[in-house]
Structures are given as C-alpha cells and as structure tokens.
Amino acid sequence: MLDLLKISVTGDPSSGKTEACQVFEDLGAYVISADKVSHSFLVPYTSVGQRIIDLLGPEIIIENTLSRKAIAEKVFGNRDLLLSLEEILHPEVCRFVEEKYAHVVQEQKYPLFIAEFPLLYEIQYADWFDQVILISADTGIRKERFLKKTGGSDTSFDLRCARFSSLEEKILRADVVIENNGTKEEFRCKVKQCFKALKGTI
C-alpha cells in the first residue's frame, strides 16, 4: 500500500489557507489545523498549560481557560515572549499532527492528508511533508480581509505578519503556489484543480 500523501497548506495571515483547506475537506481529504491543535493546549492544569502560565503569568487565565486574546496582547510585539511560547507549543502540535497522521493512515479512507501550518517554514517543519502548497495574496488584500474578519487594527495585522518569513522566500521553496487575489469562486476553482492534480500523483 502506498503511503498517504502528507500535504501542508501554508501562507501569510489572511491569505486564504483556511478556505483552501475547507475545499480540500469538502472533496474528501483529511484536514487538520495546526492553529486549532495549538488552541486545544490552551487549558490550565495540564503540563503544557502550566508552562504557558509560568511564561506569561496567571492573568491569562480567564473563566478557567487560557485566554487567546490575553495571550495575543502579551506576545504580539514582544518577539522573545512569542518565540518562547512557540517553543512550548510547536513541538506538541507537531507531535499531535504526526500521531494523527499515523491514525489516519490506518483508517485507509482518505485520499490525502492535509495540514494547515501557518508557520511551516518558520519552525523548520516543511521537510516532514511530501508537498507544500503556498497560498499567496497581495498584502493590501490580506489586510482588508483581516480587518473585515477580526475587526482588528492595522497595527495588529502588522504585528502578526512580522513573525512570517518573506513571501518571495516561501514561493521559491513551495511545491505549489495558489494565488488568491480574486474572487472566492475563482480561488475555490484553483484549489479544486490542485486537488485533482494531487490525486493524480497517488
């Protein structure tokens, strides 16, 4: 039996990664989100949660959970704190994804294994995957999407983008680049074409 292809979808903030993954999932792929996995670790009274509390302080505990908003306010704009938080979370996220992949392989029911990893290249994790799909979009378009979706500020967008490596560098390294500067329908069509091409390599 051929191994189940491991595909990562990555890209800058508000580029369209989640939308692409939704299309892949609708077409039958198994999809997992690194962000959602990391959020699942944001609970107190666990070893990971306690390490995060030790790093950022007990004030991040709100209503018996670790507040993502409180965490974001502390780490965005403070690179040292952000990197320290990532050093706690990313190994756990990668371990979880690899365990999930092993489980999905055994199920033998999905054509592709897709993992949405925003900071794939930044944490040096691309080599684990068979192929990397980069979703790209112009900065102005991404900012407009971010502001509309989150109600955040230009500053909050810029702070989030600061952690990401250059788009040009990622384009050179990615196996597939899907541009998302047009309509949602145009983008979804491109992703569907990508899915068909990937299935053809199995």
UniProtKB/Swiss-Prot annotation:
Name of this chain's protein: Dephospho-CoA kinase
Superkingdom field: Bacteria
Biological function: Catalyzes the phosphorylation of the 3'-hydroxyl group of dephosphocoenzyme A to form coenzyme A.
EC number: 2.7.1.24
Chief site of localization: cytoplasm
NCBIfam families: dephospho-CoA kinase
Pathway: Cofactor biosynthesis; coenzyme A biosynthesis; CoA from (R)-pantothenate: step 5/5
GO biological process: coenzyme A biosynthetic process
HAMAP family attached to this UniProt entry: Dephospho_CoA_kinase
A GO CC term attached to the entry: cytoplasm
Reaction it catalyzes: 3'-dephospho-CoA + ATP = ADP + CoA + H(+)
Stored CDD domains: DPCK (cd02022)
Subcellular locations according to the entry: Cytoplasm
InterPro entries listed in its UniProt record: Depp_CoAkinase, P-loop_NTPase
PROSITE patterns given in the database record: DPCK
